[in-house]
Amino acid sequence: MSEKSKVYFADFRCFPMRENLPQRLARLIMTAGFGSIDMDNKYVAIKMHFGEPGNQAYLRPNWARVVADLVKDQGGKPFLTDCNTLYMGGRKNALDHIESAYQNGFNPYNTGCHILIADGLKGSDDVEVPVSGGEYVKTAKIGRAVMDADVFVSLTHFKGHEQAGMGGTLKNIGMGCGSRAGKMEMHSSGKPVVKREKCVGCRACAIICAHGAPQFDEEGKADIDINQCAGCGRCLTICPKDAIAARNDAAPAILNKKMAEYSKAVVNGRPCFHISLVIDVSPHCDCHSENDVPLVPNVGMFASFDPVALDQACADAVVAQPALPGSMLFDEACACNKGDHFKRSHPNSDWNVCLEHAEKLGLGRRAYKLVRI
């Protein structure tokens, strides 16, 4: 794998009367080879994060419009998509998720296409996809609408992440396309836990479980027998009180490897293209209902057929920047304020693990050639 993958780059500089930023992104995407993909009469999934309500760092819907319009220009049928979240918030079921997306501007009038929440109303509509060579994941649970698409395009807001280190293309694909059960598998050992204070003893979990894992004490409260649990996550999606949750016991390195393995399940065997914007590089995920000062100045737009090379190029670009004054990393006593900003932000994480594992799985190369337009 000595050959370098091409990653195309454009900065955010605009000159009067030439092109605006959406036009610049369109030119970048087409220069990178987007037009070579056969999209005629094909369903094209555009995977992105709509942002938790209250967060202001997520990608604006204008960016999604650029991609959707290019897909339609090539005869494709685009839709924006994401999967539901594990945690309480505005995106844990499809209705709330779409409402949150609308609040943040992602409606058909702004984006030129509709939204499909890939894992359905309650996050239980998934497809089990084999992962060849997976160290931790043998069968990934991917949102059905993602797998039903003929072409897959990722549109990523490149940023930090408290567990993975950074939230790039592989996180957008791997974690983002996992159903609620899939996210539980990535975040934990794959076995759920019951929050006793929320359990009302309705036994919905026992009814849906095919393995007899839910057990009930003298108060009627549920508990999960991990020796019987198969880790399917169905109880998590069926509980009406959100009393069942993931254990969140996966070490950061394991989480990163699982994300790479889930990414392989998504992209394997069909045309894919990846876009990443290094803008408003917040230290935390857009899943937060708030966002801190960006870690570094805005860098630009990147695009590639190779998601591994794309993440590496974006990471290198961020690391090369000085810390932004006012950010959590800026130290007035330090003249350089450089280094691995993601590692500095989240010392217990290591984003390199995800890229190393993805390369090992054959998802792409870390070696890249940057092509500026």
Language-model-derived ranges and their functions:
Residues 2-63, 73-82, 87-373:
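Extended, low-polarity segments enriched in aliphatic/aromatic residues
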